[in-house]
Amino acid sequence: MQQDYCPDIAKLAEGGFNKVFILRAKNGREVIARIPTPIAGPAHYTTASEVATMDFLRAVLKLPVPEVFAYSTTSENPVGAEYILMERVEGESLSSRWLSLTTDEVKDIMIQIAEMERKIFDFRFPAYGSLYHTKDLDWKHQIPIVEDFVIGPVSSREFWHGERSKTEIDRGPCRVSPLSTFPFILGFLEKEPTGTGLIIAVGLSPLDCVTSAARREMAVIQRHAKPQPRQTFLLPTNYNIHPSEHTSLLSQFLQVAPHLIRPGSYSAPTLRHPDLSLSNILLAPGTSKIISIIDWQGATILPRFMQAGYPAFCHHDSSQPQSLEIPSLPDDFDKMGIDEQRQIKAIFRLEEANLYYTAATGVHNEEHMNVLKIPHLGMQQYLLRQTGYPWDADVINLRAALVGITTPSVWSKISSAACPVEFSEEEREAAIAESQEWNESEQLLSRVREHLNIDLEGGTEPDNFERAVEGNRQLRIEMVRQAEAGQQEICWRNWPYKDQEDNSMPPQR
C-alpha cells in the first residue's frame, strides 16, 4: 500500500477458519487482511499454500483471483499472527444476486466457470500435494513446477489435526510416475521378483494418494484411539464400540482401493477450488461477469477422479442420469406468497444451474465431463471421504459405503475383477437399515440448525445468540421429554449442541 500506517481497520467477517479485516490507508485505498484461526490448518503450511495457489492461478493461468501484496507464514511478527494482505475486489457476491439473475445470466456464469476450470484441468501437474513458493518449503519436500512454484505436502487440515500433527503419516508430495498411466506395464512389473528401480515406480501410482487418508486414520487409531460409546444424534449407544471395528473397515477399503483407480487422464493430478460456493464468486456490479474467485485455503492437487464433481450451487443427483429437460417455475408461481416463491425459486435456480453447468462443462471442459461419466463416481467419492473421518465410534456411513460399492450390480460397473470384499446378506441389510436411520437423524438435526439459525458447529451471528441459546435449551428439554423410558439420560448427554464441560443431568419430568 506504500503507506506508513492504516488509520482505519474494520472487521469484515469472522468464521471458523479465518478473521477478515479491511485496512484503509490514508489515501483511501483498501486491502483485505486475512488471519487464519488456530483450527484453520497446520501453521505455516496453510498460509504458504494459499498464497502460492492464488499467485499461481493469477500469474501462470491468468485467472481472476485476488492479488497478494504481502504475507507472513509465522506468528513471530508485529501482528502476532500469520496473515495475508490481498487486493480488495469491488464486486458483488454471486450469492447476493443468485435469485435475481436471468436465465441468460445463469448460462453466462456457468460458461465462465467451465472455461476457468478448463484452464486448471489443462495444466499438467507432476505430482499430488499442495502448491507452495520455493522459498516457503524445505528443499527436500518440494517438486518443481514452473517459475518458483513447487508442489509440497498436503496442507489440508485433516492431515494435521490433533494427534496427526505428531504422527508419521504420508502427506506427500507424491510424484506421479508415467508408468501409472499404463496399467499393462504395471501388471508386468508387479510380477517381477526383484526390487528394481522400475518396481519402485509402482509405488508412485495414484493408489498412494487414494489410500493416504485411510492409512492416516489407521495409524492414528492404532496409537491413540480408545473404546467409547457412539454419540451420534438419535443413534447413541450405552456400550463401548471398539476402534478395531473402524480399522477393520478401513482394511477392507484398502483391499477395494486398487480397483477404484482409473488409468491415464482420469488420475491426472488436478487442482480444484475446495469450496466453489456462491459467496466465493464475485461479479462485476450489475453484470454477470466474474471478476474474482476467492477463498482458496486448503486447495490441493489430487487425482482427477477424486476432484471431479458439481459445485454446491448445482442440484445434482449422481444416482440418476442427467436430465436435459429445461426447468420451469410452476404455472401458479405468481399466485404464491413471498416465502413460498423464494423457496420455489431457490430450487428452480439450483436445477437451472445444474443443467447449464453440465452443458457448459460438456462444451468447454471435455476432460472434466469424461470423468463425470465414470459409473458410480459419486458412490466412489463418498467412500473415499468416509475413509478420512476420525474415530468417534460412528462407522455407520463407512460401513454402508463399503456395502454399497461391493454390491454386485454396482461393482460390475466399476471393475471386471472379482470383488475382494464380501458381506453377507444379513450384514448388508443391517448396514442399509442403520444408514437410513442415520440419514433420518441428520435430516432432523438439519431442521434443528435451521430453526436455531446456527451452523454445523453450533455457531451463529451475535444478534441471534441469545435466541439460539434459549431455543437450543428448549429443544434439548423437549428431546428428553419425548425419549423412551430409560433413555432420557443418554439423550440429554448426547445432545450435539452443548458445552464440552456440561456434565449435567436431565431435568425431571
Curated annotation (Swiss-Prot):
One matching Pfam family: APH
Induction record: Expression is regulated by the hypoxia responsive morphology factor A (hrmA).
Keyword Electron transport listed: no
Superkingdom per UniProt: Eukaryota
Keyword Cytoplasm: no
Keywords: Cell adhesion, Virulence
GO terms for biological process, alphabetical: cell adhesion
Xref: InterPro entries: Aminoglycoside_PTrfase (IPR002575), Kinase-like_dom_sf (IPR011009), Mito_inheritance_9 (IPR051035)
Its job: Part of the subtelomeric hrmA-associated cluster (HAC) containing genes that alter the hyphal surface (such as reduced total chitin or increased beta-glucan exposure) and perturb inter-hyphal interactions within the developing biofilms, resulting in a loss of vertically aligned polarized growing filaments. Consequently, this hypoxia-typic morphotype (called H-MORPH) with altered biofilm architecture leads to increased hypoxia fitness, increased host inflammation, rapid disease progression, and mortality in a murine model of invasive aspergillosis.
Listed name of the protein: Subtelomeric hrmA-associated cluster protein AFUA_5G14880
